[in-house]
Amino acid sequence: MGHSKVSKANTHARLVEAAAARFKERGVDGISLADLMKDLELTHGGFYKHFASRDELVTEALELALTQSGQAMRDRLFSGDKPDIAGFVDVYLDESHRDGRAAGCAVAALAGDAPRKSAEVQAQFRKQIERNLEALSEALGPGSADESRATALLILSALYGALTMARAVGDSPLSREVLRTVRKQILNLSGPAGKPRARAKAK
């Protein structure tokens, strides 16, 4: 690949990465193309060398944000010899995650935008949430597939909802109460004494 093509590919990647972070921080409609390009010290007109439209950037940026969040979730759940649901929940419902939207969970940050976007965007969310459910179901361990999925769905919904609510009320006693209470209830679901259930041994 020639130098100009490498440079263009690098700029394209920078645009997608920056958009993914800013969308999580401000919402999909919370930053203009002009501001995004200015933040990256690029010309507004140069945008169309990389994308046919803003919607095309949105699609790519959401794909990146959702994939990265999903991979971070899986990495945290399976970082040791045994699944660590407690560790994942601790990190997810930490105040630093509440306050760090740009580097945090894309589903919690952007799910509110999805109903107003295209069917393609909604399909992206659906695909990633299914992947997240699969990862959490696997981490939960023994039990029927239906039971594990139901528990995983309840936990994920509680996580997304708690983070959204905690952010909505700002850094306040209520915000901290939401994080603390939901964490405790989730750990009661995920195994005895708040510890992750052991996975079934391979036969």
Question: Which ranges hold each PLM region?
Answer:
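Alpha-helical DNA-contacting segments of helix-turn-helix folds
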Residues: F51, V58-A65, A72
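Amphipathic, non-transmembrane alpha-helical scaffold segments
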Residues: H12, V16, L62, L66, ...
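Active-site oxyanion/phosphate-handling segment shared across diverse enzymes
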Residues: I129-A139
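Hydrophobic/aromatic-rich alpha-helical bundle segments in the mid-to-C-terminal region
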Residues: A119-K127, L140-R197, K201-K203
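Amphipathic alpha-helical segments used for helix-helix packing
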Residues: D84-G87, D99-R126
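Helix-turn-helix
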Residues: R14, A18-V58
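Hydrophobic alpha-helical connector segments
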Residues: E60, R74-G104, A152-I155
